[in-house]
Amino acid sequence: MENVILNCQNLYKHFGKKEILKGISFEICSGDILGFIGPNGSGKTTTIKLILGLQSIDNGSVEINGFNVVKNFEKAIEKVGAIVENPDLYMYLSGYDNLKLVANLYKGIDSKRIDEVIKLVGLENRINDKVSKYSLGMRQRLGLAQAILHKPNLLILDEPTNGLDPEGIKDLRELLVKLATAEHMGILISSHNLAELESFCTKVCIIKNGVIIESSEIDVVKSECSDSYYIFDVDDSKKAQPVSGGGLPPGGAKLVNVSQHAVSSLA
């Protein structure tokens, strides 16, 4: 039986009269890497903030390791690591000193664990350099090291590929796969670009205007769309289907109410 780490059920969130989330549900199990995909303003970051208790939930529930985030916040959040937006780093300190500061916030993190995490993220040769000398990709890896020091089983990353070059994205991809397998983590990674995530995610959820319009195993998406997968923005998907006729691209298409930000080749 799969070990469910994160369970989000029927989440709603309003800001004033604007409805941001409209009853979204999904779950993450141990070893899952879930790509949470959607254009800017779709509700990705709001969802993450609800999961982490940074914003209040209007309706619905979030459970982490069986603990309700609202009713038992400390227990729910104790095995969670997260980077929302950019890693929080002291640029004038070394990478090692940054990790020591975070380690002091928890009980039981010794130098052996710090060294273990440094090796895991591949910063052994630069860990004593000042962070100001790090590349963006190296800072991202140091941020990940901070997030996993206390051995969480859920890792949440909000748009971690922003600003990374192709080599940095490749390094991040390999590191996340290693964490999911070696550390048995469940990982939620948000992005507006499915193409950056589809090669290593095990699941995908596509969100638009606060609604999840596609949720499945990534292998299922690939098998259904053997050549390319296209998502078109239409006013009425039922009416558009017969009209599309032979104009559909090879490999199939899905006609839903979603921005073309989600269009991606899944060859």
What are these regions (language model features)?
Residues 155-159:
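Catalytic Walker B motif of ABC-type/P-loop ATPase nucleotide-binding domains
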Residues 60-71, 75-76:
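Conserved ABC transporter NBD signature motif
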Residues 100, 111-126:
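Conserved ABC ATPase "signature" region
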Residues 151:
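Conserved catalytic motifs of ABC-family nucleotide-binding domains
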Residues 173-263:
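ABC transporter nucleotide-binding domain
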